[in-house]
């Protein structure tokens, strides 16, 4: 079984330090992103950086189903959430009200909780080489979490000595994500219209937190997780050369680093 390597040399695939806690950057602070941010504020050591990015402002329609109060209306979501979590957990929480495309992303694990193709493309365009991106998306009562960090041309090789150092970016694993249009309604409005389960965002947030925890601890064997609330199932796709080969049409032998002597 392969496990995702957090820290490694992008040229040699030599693991440098797979036992450290990186910064985590959450892009999108609405439904799922709000639950993820709260969980990370508890999960991460206080000395480690937590950054929230969202240029949207809090509206009254967000109050019932997202992590905001009436006092937050008119504030940027990232600002309101960062200040609340900093006070709640007694830790620094940084935030940005600029779009991802306004500059390079900080180093660390990127958690994408956005709901449209252009936002995902912006994340992909501004990742550092080998920077892990955990993408979360959901429908009415189902969702997926995808993990990746590399374009196709960077995948040879990707696996070495039981570790997975590179996986295709989420938008390569599921190109249809780029075709997803921007939502006209918020998660709260979707719930009110019975177009979205009232618990799907919490469920997706919990899955994302488990993935982040396992990547940091060096125990994450997955590259995809699929949740179906109606069926009561959670289906993983393991991070293996065979799966990556099927997705990319790269030969398995090209994905595995030969043993060094």
Protein language model regions, located:
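Glycine-rich phosphate/adenylate-binding loop
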Residues: 1-8, 14-26, 30, 105-107, ...
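Glycine-rich adenosine-cofactor-binding loop
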Residues: 20-44, 51-59
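Glycine-rich phosphate-binding loop and adjoining beta1-alpha1-beta2 segment
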Residues: 49-89
């Amino acid at each position: 079984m392969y496990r995702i390597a957090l820290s490694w040399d992008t040229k040699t695939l030599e693991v440098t330090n797979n036992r450290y806690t990186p910064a985590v950057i959450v892009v999108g602070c609405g439904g799922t992103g709000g639950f993820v941010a709260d969980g990370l504020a508890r999960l991460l050591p206080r000395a480690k950086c937590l950054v929230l990015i969202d240029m949207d402002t809090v509206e009254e329609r967000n109050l019932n189903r997202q992590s905001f109060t009436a006092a937050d209306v008119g504030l940027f979501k990232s600002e309101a959430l960062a200040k609340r979590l900093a006070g709640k957990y007694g830790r620094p929480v940084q935030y940005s009200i600029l779009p991802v495309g306004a500059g390079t992303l900080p180093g660390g694990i990127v958690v994408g909780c956005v709901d449209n193709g252009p936002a995902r493309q912006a994340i992909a365009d501004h990742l550092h080489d080998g920077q892990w991106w955990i993408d979360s998306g959901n429908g009415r009562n189902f969702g997926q979490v995808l993990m990746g960090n590399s374009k196709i041309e960077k995948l040879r090789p990707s696996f070495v000595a039981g570790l997975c150092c590179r996986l295709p970016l989420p938008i390569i694993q599921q190109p249809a994500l780029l075709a997803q249009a921007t939502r006209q309604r918020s998660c709260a409005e979707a719930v009110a219209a019975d177009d979205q389960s009232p618990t799907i965002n919490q469920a997706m947030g919990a899955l994302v937190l488990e993935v982040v925890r396992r990547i940091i601890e060096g125990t994450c064997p997955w590259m995809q997780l699929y949740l179906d609330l109606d069926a009561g199932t959670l289906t993983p796709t393991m991070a293996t050369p065979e799966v990556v080969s099927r997705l990319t049409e790269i030969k398995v032998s090209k994905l595995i680093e030969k043993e060094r002597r």
